[in-house]
């Protein structure tokens, strides 16, 4: 037989064998035997070296046509086998559609998210706006605009994660005070805002400390804002969070960005002020820091501190959640232990 006859014979045998193939392994073996590098077609085409220049294109075109035809029929056969395998599996696997399905367990919001949303709802009801800020902050806004110049000794109060000399992970949400005052148009009225978010300190993680935690900054700036406004606001918020019978105690303190500054304690909700292990037998629990916005902070935002005044405060979400729900280890918020989290579904 000449090469043309050999290719035609190979074509007929290959297509005939293809019809009887019943599984994918046999199908792949057939392709290898007939068209592989060491297959029959390759052996036949080795004889092209003995052909004339006129005969070679004819044989080459015939071989290519055979490859194309086999390729199309190969893919069709492969699809047929896959469909047959699927049909057989469906027939062998019985499914009783009347059986009840598997119940899907609903997820829930994280306890810190629940706490934040509850606090936000209180302040929204009081006419506050909620603003978001940068977790990667500049030294200028994190410290200098908060009345903490580079040589200020109070910078030692906060161990900071620096990214560069001028860029850091914010140590508090207070930078949003300056950023919001810069953007606010005071000719249209005063400013009332809260800024929730993550903050970072170089603390060693233990039961009461974390290198990352959540803080809600509050700020009110307008004409004729007084300490009485601050006291009334926090009294309302704390009673909504911890119960109407709670009382607040105000202690002098120091924060560079407020003057005067105060620490606010809440009467113990477990013992009613009699003294217990929760309040360390004092009857009071430290809950937040606050104060009147320092005149320097106002002036750096372009406000006349003789005309405008304001108050600011900082709430720790983890601390509030721990006190409300009797949680004694802050690490539980971040470890993703379902046994802990599902208590607050």
Curated annotation (Swiss-Prot):
Pfam families: Phe_tRNA-synt_N, tRNA-synt_2d. Belongs to the class-II aminoacyl-tRNA synthetase family. Phe-tRNA synthetase alpha subunit type 1 subfamily. Signal peptide: none annotated. This is Phenylalanine--tRNA ligase alpha subunit. It is found in: Cytoplasm. GO terms for biological process: phenylalanyl-tRNA aminoacylation. The gene is pheS. Binds 2 magnesium ions per tetramer. It catalyses: tRNA(Phe) + L-phenylalanine + ATP = L-phenylalanyl-tRNA(Phe) + AMP + diphosphate + H(+).
């Amino acid at each position: 037989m000449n090469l043309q006859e050999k290719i035609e014979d190979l074509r007929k045998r290959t297509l005939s064998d293809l019809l009887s193939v019943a599984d994918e392994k046999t199908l792949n073996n057939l392709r290898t035997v007939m068209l592989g590098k060491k297959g029959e077609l390759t052996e036949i085409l080795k004889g092209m070296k003995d052909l004339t220049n006129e005969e070679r294109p004819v044989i080459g075109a015939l071989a290519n046509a055979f490859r194309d035809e086999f390729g199309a029929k190969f893919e069709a056969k492969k699809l047929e086998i896959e469909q047959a395998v699927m049909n057989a599996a469906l027939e062998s696997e019985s499914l009783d559609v009347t059986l009840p399905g598997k119940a899907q367990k609903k997820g829930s919001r994280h306890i810190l998210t629940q706490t934040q949303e509850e606090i936000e709802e209180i302040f929204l009801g009081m006419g506050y706006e909620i603003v978001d800020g940068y977790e990667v902050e500049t030294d200028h806004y994190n410290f200098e605009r908060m009345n903490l110049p580079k040589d200020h000794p109070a910078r030692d109060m906060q161990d900071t994660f620096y990214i560069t000399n001028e860029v850091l992970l914010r140590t508090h949400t207070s930078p949003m005070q300056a950023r919001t005052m810069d953007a606010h148009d005071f000719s249209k009225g005063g400013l009332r805002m809260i800024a929730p978010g993550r903050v970072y300190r170089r603390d060693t993680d233990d039961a009461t400390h974390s290198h990352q935690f959540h803080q809600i900054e509050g700020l009110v700036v307008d004409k004729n804002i007084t300490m009485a406004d601050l006291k009334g606001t926090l009294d309302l918020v704390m009673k909504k969070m911890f119960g109407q019978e709670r009382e607040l105690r105000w202690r002098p303190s120091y924060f560079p960005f407020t003057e005067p500054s105060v620490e606010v304690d809440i009467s113990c909700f477990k013992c009613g002020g009699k003294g217990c292990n929760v309040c360390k037998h004092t009857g009071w629990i430290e809950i937040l820091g606050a104060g009147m916005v320092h005149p320097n902070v106002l002036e750096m935002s372009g406000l006349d501190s003789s005309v405008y005044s304001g108050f600011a405060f900082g709430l720790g979400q983890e601390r509030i959640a721990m006190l409300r729900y009797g949680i004694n280890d802050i690490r539980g918020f971040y470890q993703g232990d379902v046994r802990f989290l599902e208590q607050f579904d």
